[in-house]
Amino acid sequence: MSGPLQYKWFFESTTPVEGHMHAIARTISTLQTKFQFMEIFETHSYGKVLVLDGRIQSSQHDEFIYHEILVQPGLLAHPKPVRAMVIGGGEGATVREILRHPSITDCLMVDIDGEVVEECKKHLPEMHQGVFDDKRTRVLHEDARAYLRRPRSASTSSWSTCPSRSKRARPACSSPRSSTR
């Protein structure tokens, strides 16, 4: 008989007084980068999971829900999208959704953490489905704020996967001050 003590568990708090537990089938990769602590493991219920600084970013069996909704409404509303930019998105699933549109000729992903992107390329092919090898994909490993301050074409659609606030790295999409509106 299987029981909870036979598994290694991952616990993620969802509120100060509540959380969710996942039984881990196997650990695939753990890595402390300059910017964050990354884990990739496989769970019994959700398949492979990408975790950054203790927060789940994507899980194999349900990531399509988030990534399709993030990308498809904007691209479907556009008459002919040609270029796109993704801020963050290390596992490649946002780029995957963008490249479903044949009119896209160039998709730039700006993700500060190249080590995480490389681990995702290696261990999460179910999520990125080979987009890193697509000639339309370009990847830059730099601070998105610095990149966005440089002049660029105004005709590029952009998406931010906006990671949770980290003590080590502030997301490029966060505001330096809270809005009171």
Question: Which functions belong to the PLM regions below?
Answer:
Residues M1-V49:
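N-terminal auxiliary segments of SAM/dcSAM-dependent transferases
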Residues S2-F10, T33, S58-R181:
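The AdoMet/dcAdoMet-binding core of the Class I SAM-like
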